[in-house]
Curated annotation (Swiss-Prot):
The keyword Manganese applies. DNA ligase that catalyzes the formation of phosphodiester linkages between 5'-phosphoryl and 3'-hydroxyl groups in double-stranded DNA using NAD as a coenzyme and as the energy source for the reaction. It is essential for DNA replication and repair of damaged DNA. NAD(+) binds at residues 30-34, 79-80, 105, 128, 162, 301. It comes from Campylobacter jejuni subsp. jejuni serotype O:23/36 (strain 81-176). Belongs to the NAD-dependent DNA ligase family. LigA subfamily. Transmembrane segments: none annotated. The gene is ligA. The active site is at residue 107. Keywords: DNA damage, DNA repair, DNA replication, Ligase, Magnesium, Manganese, Metal-binding, NAD, Zinc. This is DNA ligase. Pfam families: BRCT, DNA_ligase_aden, DNA_ligase_OB, HHH_2. GO terms for biological process: DNA repair; DNA replication.
Length: 647
């Protein structure tokens, strides 16, 4: 890199840094910024006489501008040096002249917070700011339930940590903001930071923030190891993560990194790496600090789950109900080992809310098996070549005129090929008729060759229909035909679910089956609306569907031997009338536990509240278990549950 290019990159890095910290409007993804900073460091290490005093590597990030008063930290809050692979970790350890006894813990992706306690009482809370001075957010800190307001330690002490929003809570916040037509938070970190800096403290309170301590500032503690300090802090009443380790050497650190990385998707909060710190406090003191970082600790970063790429087009998908879903076509980008070429845009209201255009630079996030989504549009990087994404007028599949209902745009042609194919795929899926071997690709193949054209035609398939089709031999054909025959013996609620009625899922289908049996499709609006858990929207949807399809449903009855599950509820057991929430991985499918609880007169809910009686948890239970403990809900594992049902 030449000096001119270096100075250009310094200017770009400063532009991105100011946009992030001062305007709260990022112009690049974290990964792009990290790469740029690393390029600057490489040049500066090789050209020490040409380092610019304006380089972001030479200064702490600026404080976010706000209406909050400033508050000085008693001791500086430092950033951490980032390392990205084994060689960089070993290089850091070599510089620190230490290769043994490391304290490691998750690096949560949230907002740093400094708490000051005097005489055992919480007196202030402040953001990191520039490291020396932060923003006084004390009133908001008092609204965070898991931060102790009083501790059993009378000396003055600063306790530092990370404020996070759990993934489940983040999704709920964005769902609520979408309903209010407010801009969505790009990620849980931005949501946590924004929640801390609210002028209305009630907003902070409702966001359900969590505080995890990671260190201390000013203190008079007399410990020799950082691990002892953290054990003491957590005994004062602070949250402790379950992945905290002492590693004897760097090989153990690398093993711990792999273990934590494997837990990344299962953790209830976002992590972007692992903190590696020398445990010996005397050695830490001896090593000291650079202009920006402590020499005794580093952030061992995870591969990015969020990257910047360009949106180069939009494809339209037609669902089984006719809803048109826009899908962004992206320049391919590698996210944690997966090449991502597309991302959901949800609907055209979301496109308008994002103000995204073709040829825009966008930030894309991928989490586990969740469909990649666009979280940010970098509008300040537009080059004048961007094109509006217009609302479609015609169905991309059948070219019929679309019905524009605002948020949803629908194809009303019931013979539309994509609608039919997706309806059949849903009809035969695991939670519906569960026809083994009749997957998405085979449905598309059979439809293409006109072997199936309606839901009913599945049950008229013959051996000869498969002969000559690629991949079908005698055994496979017979297995599939046998699976179709077995599907004729089907529970009524599965058949109702399979029909794909708008707003009617598995739970509602069970209620219809148990309440009305095979006459479920001949009821009045009032009868539907009066069912527990049903409302006007569901009743209207049922009335409209059954009005059009009641004859067709009767014809299905001739093809299928539908069974009606009769729920015999035991009303004298300890589970009767109790509400359960199930979380984590158990020895058997959750549906089996759910069925048993309902048979014994209990109810299974999807979320934890003060009305929850029991949380049944398995391995790798997440945010629901944390919330249950905070609400003091009784938490039982599988063996305790088995004992309970015996009573």
């Amino acid at each position: 890199m030449k000096k001119e290019e270096y100075l250009e990159k310094v200017a770009l890095a400063n532009l991105w840094m100011r946009a992030y910290y001062e305007k709260d409007e990022p112009l690049a993804s974290d990964e792009e910024y990290d790469v740029l900073i690393r390029e600057l460091r490489v040049f500066e290490e090789q050209n020490k006489d040409e380092i610019s005093k304006d380089s972001p590597t030479q200064k702490i990030a600026p404080t976010i501008q706000s209406e909050f008063k400033k508050i000085a930290h008693l001791k500086r809050m430092w950033s951490m040096e980032d390392v990205f692979d084994e060689s960089e970790l070993r290089a850091w350890a070599k510089r620190a002249k230490c290769e043994k006894n490391f304290f490691i813990e998750p690096k949560f992706d949230g907002a740093s917070l400094n708490l000051l306690y005097e005489n055992g009482k919480l007196v202030s809370g402040a953001t990191r700011g520039d490291g020396e001075v932060g923003e006084d957010i004390t009133l908001n800190v008092f609204e965070i339930e898991n931060i102790p307001k009083n501790i059993a330690y009378k000396e003055r002490i600063e306790i530092r940590g990370e404020v996070v929003i759990l993934k489940d809570d983040f999704e709920k916040i964005n769902e609520k903001r979408a309903l209010l037509n407010q801009s969505l938070f790009a990620n849980p970190r931005n949501a946590a930071s924004g929640s801390l800096r609210q002028l209305d403290t009630s907003i902070t309170k409702e966001r359900n923030l969590k505080f995890y301590p990671w260190g201390v500032g000013e203190n008079t503690l007399n410990f020799t190891k950082h691990s002892e300090v953290m054990q003491f802090i957590r005994e004062l009443g602070f949250l402790k993560d379950d992945f905290i380790k002492l590693c004897a050497n760097l090989d153990e650190v690398l093993k711990a990194y792999d273990e934590l990385l494997a837990l990344r998707e299962k953790k209830p909060m976002m992590m972007d790496g692992m903190v590696v710190r020398i445990d010996d406090l005397a050695l830490c003191e001896e090593l000291g600090y650079t202009v920006k970082f402590p020499k005794f600790m580093a952030a061992f970063k995870f591969p990015a789950l969020e990257k910047t790429t360009r949106l180069i087009g939009v494809n339209l998908q037609v669902g089984r109900s006719g809803v048109i879903t826009p899908v962004a076509v992206l320049e391919p980008v590698n996210l944690d080992g997966v090449v991502v070429k597309s991302a959901t845009l949800h609907n055209f209201d979301e496109i308008a809310r994002l103000d995204v255009k073709i040829n825009d630079f966008v930030s894309v996030i991928r989490s586990g098996d969740v469909i990649p989504k666009i979280t940010k549009v970098f509008k300040d990087r537009r080059e004048g070549l961007e094109m509006e994404i217009s609302r479609p007028k015609l169905c991309p599949t059948c070219q019929s005129e679309l019905l524009d209902e605002g948020t949803l745009i629908k194809c009303q042609n019931i013979d539309c090929e994509d609608r039919l194919v997706n309806s059949i795929i849903h009809f035969v899926s695991k939670k519906c008729l569960n026809i083994d071997g009749l997957g998405e690709n085979i449905v598309e193949l059979l439809y293409k060759h006109k072997k199936i054209t309606t839901l009913e035609s599945i049950f008229h398939l013959k051996f000869s229909d498969f002969e000559g089709l690629e991949g079908f031999k005698e055994k496979k054909i017979n297995n599939l035909l046998n699976a179709i025959e077995q599907a004729r013996e089907c529970e009524l609620f599965r058949f109702i679910t399979a029909l794909g009625i708008e707003h009617i899922g598995e739970v509602a289908a069970k209620k219809l089956s148990l309440s009305f049996g095979k006459e479920w499709h001949k009821q009045s609006f009032e009868a539907y609306a009066n069912l527990e858990g049903f409302g006007e929207q569901m009743a209207l949807s049922l009335c409209e569907f059954t009005r059009v399809n009641h004859v067709r449903i009767d014809e299905f009855y001739k093809l299928l031997n539908l069974k009606i599950e009769k729920l015999e509820i035991k009303s004298d057991g300890v589970i009767f009338g109790k509400t359960f929430v199930i979380t984590g991985t158990l020895s058997r499918p959750r549906d089996e536990f759910k069925a048993l609880i309902e048979k014994l007169g209990g109810k299974v809910s999807s979320s934890v509240s003060k009305k929850t009686d029991y949380v049944l948890f398995g391995e790798e239970a997440g945010s629901k278990l944390i919330k249950a403990k905070e609400l003091e809900v009784k938490c039982i594992d599988e063996s305790a549950f088995n004992e309970l049902v015996k009573e």
